[in-house]
């Protein structure tokens, strides 16, 4: 992985300061910063980074936990009502007191035909059975139940496809939460860890020292001896919204801006497990040595 590559170099603090990790969009900084925090590698960023625990997937997990132990409120229920997809879209579902009785009443009085009413009632019953299974479960057991019986990871895949995202972007959060949950015996321990994680991230960013994290855009005017550019795959570099690249020339220019930030070494990488095509810009770059400077060592890693 990327962090392993960095650790193997056994960098000094000065070498950290002369290293940058670049990416197309700021959301990619969440994963990178978490990996660096885990390995206690110093870093800073050219713009704010969202903590991985400030994500809707973690809020879903907390809502399921609270509903499982009987302290969930209406907001918790509404948040996870269709996570995974239960097709409970009637506005009346979101106006109940959250009880099984009221939700079943809404399901039984849907105007969409008998089979849809029956399916909605089954979905409500299954949801409350899931809450029962989560009662008094540890963090890791909760996630395992949500993944298996709750079909939550399948939901993440379907959600990503619907949003034209790589499922790996959401799997990162889920798998990271699972890994953290395995290290904590109860919810109090995990909550303390979450709070500490947020503090560590903010303290690290305030120090403004170590490896620089930056979007390609924010890297303009800066230079480092060693530069890593992440996720060099089609639809990320160049960046595509809903599968469409709005300005190919601007995307190409941004990529070359990132490449020319390297004074000595340039590493181009893509996500581990990403099945996407390698960025077309890489072929262009490799065909013209002068694009990155004659003295820059260019290396392409297909995975990190």
Name each model-derived stretch.
Residues 29, 55-58, 74, 90, ...:
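Amphipathic alpha-helical transducer elements in NTP-driven molecular machines
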Residues 1-71, 211, 222-224, 230:
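Conserved motor-region signature of P-loop NTPase helicases/translocases
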Residues 226, 233-304:
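Accessory/regulatory regions of helicases
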Residues 55-56, 71-72, 137, 164-168, ...:
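Structural motif
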Residues 90-92, 103-106, 222-225, 237-240:
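Extended hydrophobic-aromatic, low-complexity segments
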Residues 59-81, 213, 243-246, 260-261:
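Conserved RecA-like P-loop NTPase helicase motor core
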Residues 75-107, 113-116:
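Helix-hairpin-helix
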Residues 111-218, 239, 265-267, 282, ...:
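Accessory C-terminal helicase-associated subdomains
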């Amino acid at each position: 992985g990327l962090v392993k590559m960095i650790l193997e170099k056994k960098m000094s603090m000065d070498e950290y300061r002369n290293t940058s990790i670049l990416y197309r969009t700021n959301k990619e900084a969440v994963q990178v910063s978490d990996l660096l925090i885990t390995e206690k590698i110093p870093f800073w960023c050219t713009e704010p980074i969202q903590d991985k625990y400030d994500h809707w997937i973690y809020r879903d997990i907390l809502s399921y936990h609270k509903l499982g132990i009987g302290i969930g409120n209406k907001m918790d229920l509404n948040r996870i009502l269709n996570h995974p997809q239960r097709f409970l879209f009637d506005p009346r579902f979101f106006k109940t007191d959250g009880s099984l009785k009221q939700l079943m009443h809404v399901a039984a009085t849907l105007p969409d035909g008998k089979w849809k009413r029956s399916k909605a009632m089954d979905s409500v019953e299954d949801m409350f059975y899931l809450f029962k299974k989560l009662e008094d479960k540890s963090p890791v057991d909760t996630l395992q139940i949500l993944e298996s019986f709750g079909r939550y990871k399948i939901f993440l895949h379907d959600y990503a496809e619907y949003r034209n995202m790589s499922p790996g972007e959401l799997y990162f959060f889920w798998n990271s939460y699972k890994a953290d949950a395995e290290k904590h015996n109860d919810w109090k321990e995990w909550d303390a860890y979450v709070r500490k994680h947020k503090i560590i991230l903010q303290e690290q960013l305030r120090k403004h020292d170590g490896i620089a994290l930056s979007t390609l855009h924010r890297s303009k005017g800066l230079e480092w001896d060693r530069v890593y550019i992440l996720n060099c795959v089609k639809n990320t570099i160049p960046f595509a919204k809903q599968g469409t690249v709005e300005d190919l020339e601007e995307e190409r220019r941004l990529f070359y801006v990132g490449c020319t930030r390297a004074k000595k070494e340039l590493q181009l990488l893509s996500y581990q497990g990403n099945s996407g095509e390698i960025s077309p810009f890489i072929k262009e770059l490799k065909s013209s040595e002068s694009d990155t400077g004659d003295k820059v060592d260019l290396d392409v890693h297909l995975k990190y």
